[in-house]
Regions:
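Rossmann-like AdoMet
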Residues: 1-129, 133-146
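A short SAM/SAH-binding and catalytic strip from SAM-dependent methyltransferases
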Residues: 131-132, 141-171, 177
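Class I S-adenosylmethionine-dependent transferase superfamily signal
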Residues: 177-178, 223
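Core SAM-dependent methyltransferase catalytic element
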Residues: 240-276
């Protein structure tokens, strides 16, 4: 595969990017040699990883569509990554053509390719921002232009919080975003785990990128104070594996790769935040 014709401003083509590695695994072309080398090392070291990433992508789409079918018309997709198949706006606008989506990522490559996500109707925007600064993001003019925080929001944080170390309080960050929404909003979150991964594979993941896999109990903490939903018909409300959430046949969907990510969808309850 040849390199991109030009390196977008602010992009370091010599440093791997999780978004570009993910893009490569899903068949995209917005990646560089360093990303492909890392991806091939991971593919060899963790044979079920590609299955895991597709399972995670499937959860993202099912969660977004579920929210849209339950009345959510505005979405905040944090850690959105590069454009790929069935992007959030493409999925939810099949339910409501006027649904609005704001994509957020800290990789300049995402912003450079934002044109693929922007539509003539003006229902989508892409923001280059660090999720560790909720105040800056929640007050960004592009977010406020499309999202009315006085109305329910679908917050999607899939495959992103395991890149935030404990020292940055990832649980507090998620709580901050949800505290800015009104009751009736939803959180859809997935998070990498190594609980079902052999030690050698777990070490390979840590050697390749700065990543903090977490346990089921740790992932469940992201939903503290929210009303966790049942992941599929007949189940109790719980955090589960990405292949199972929303699956028509959970037993068939329970692949080894899907167990590399925990996930959940939860409803915001309680009182609305005070506005200045």
């Amino acid at each position: 595969m040849s390199e991109l014709a030009a390196v977008p401003p602010g992009v370091d083509a010599t440093k791997l990017s999780p978004a570009r590695v993910y893009d490569y695994f899903l068949g995209g072309t917005n990646n560089f040699l360093v990303d492909r080398q890392a991806a091939e090392f991971l593919r060899t070291s963790i044979p079920d990883l590609v299955d895991a990433l597709w399972a995670n992508r499937g959860f993202h789409g099912r969660a977004a569509v579920w929210m849209a079918r339950h009345g959510i018309r505005q979405f905040l997709d944090i850690g959105s990554g590069l454009p790929t198949q069935n992007n959030t706006h493409e999925s939810v606008q099949k339910i409501d053509a006027d649904a609005r989506v704001v994509y957020v990522d800290n990789d300049p490559m995402v912003a450079a390719h934002a044109g693929a996500l922007l539509d003539a109707a003006g229902t989508t925007a892409v923001i280059l921002a660090d999720l560790r600064d909720p105040d800056a993001l929640l007050n960004h003019p592009d977010l406020l232009r499309l999202i009315d925080l006085a109305e329910p929001v679908g917050v999607l944080m899939t495959d992103v919080m395991h890149f935030v170390p404990d020292d940055d309080d990832p649980w507090g960050l998620v709580a901050r975003y949800m505290a800015a929404t009104v009751p009736g909003s939803y959180l859809g979150l997935s998070h990498g785990t190594t609980e079902k991964m052999p030690p050698r594979q777990s070490q390979a993941a840590r050697d390749t990128a700065d990543v903090w896999p977490r346990s089921r109990a740790q992932v469940a903490r992201f939903f503290k104070g929210l009303e966790l939903l049942a992941p599929y018909d007949g189940a109790e409300p719980a955090v589960t594996y990405v292949g199972l959430w929303g699956a028509e046949d959970p037993e068939a969907a329970d692949s080894d790769g899907s167990r590399f990510f925990y996930c959940g969808v939860a409803r915001r309850i309680g009182t609305a935040p005070r506005r200045g």
